[in-house]
């Protein structure tokens, strides 16, 4: 299954707020309607929608998400928590959480167009797995700096998670540590996602 490229509002109307996909928010009326529908949903539907929320927020294909679930299952610790940590440490998500892009799809575009450096080297792979002490910067060209500065200027500093530090005037972000799950940028029940896949095998 390919990455979703359809209307964003259609997805948030059904699944709720997905900040990685779009800055738009569902209306109060839609949220109330979803809550009423939620009480009538089957357990399968609830698990499916949690999985879809994760997939659309991080902009993954079905195959990519399944791969992350399998890697998480082989790691030490809670599969759900490891899954969220892996997704949060993707370069496209880090760029988004630093405020260098408005959404994850936009961050992915910046990376694909080679505007982003990790530790002084161009990285053009959005799924690149970042690690503590990595330094993320805009390429030393005016176009790259202008693109990223536009978003840094408007990004709310109070929403910056505690595992990241940003230096807007240097077009630079630093990863301090692996993310604590309470700072994950999406309201999600990751255990339902793991359960969804465990029942598919």
Curated annotation (Swiss-Prot):
Residues 89-151 form the S4 RNA-binding domain. Keywords: Chloroplast, Plastid, Ribonucleoprotein, Ribosomal protein, RNA-binding, rRNA-binding. Part of the 30S ribosomal subunit. Contacts protein S5. The interaction surface between S4 and S5 is involved in control of translational fidelity. This is Small ribosomal subunit protein uS4c. PROSITE patterns: RIBOSOMAL_S4, S4. Its main location: plastid. GO terms for molecular function: rRNA binding; structural constituent of ribosome. One of the primary rRNA binding proteins, it binds directly to 16S rRNA where it nucleates assembly of the body of the 30S subunit. InterPro entries: Ribosomal_uS4 (IPR022801), Ribosomal_uS4_bac-type (IPR005709), Ribosomal_uS4_CS (IPR018079), Ribosomal_uS4_N (IPR001912), S4_RNA-bd (IPR002942), S4_RNA-bd_sf (IPR036986). GO terms for cellular component: chloroplast; small ribosomal subunit. Belongs to the universal ribosomal protein uS4 family. CDD domains: S4. It holds the Pfam family Ribosomal_S4. The lineage of its organism: Eukaryota, Viridiplantae, Streptophyta, Embryophyta, Tracheophyta. It is found in: Plastid, Chloroplast. GO terms for biological process: ribosomal small subunit biogenesis; translation. It comes from the Eukaryota. SMART domains: Ribosomal_S4, S4. PANTHER family: 30S 40S RIBOSOMAL PROTEIN, SMALL RIBOSOMAL SUBUNIT PROTEIN US4M. NCBIfam families: PRK05327.1, rpsD_bact.
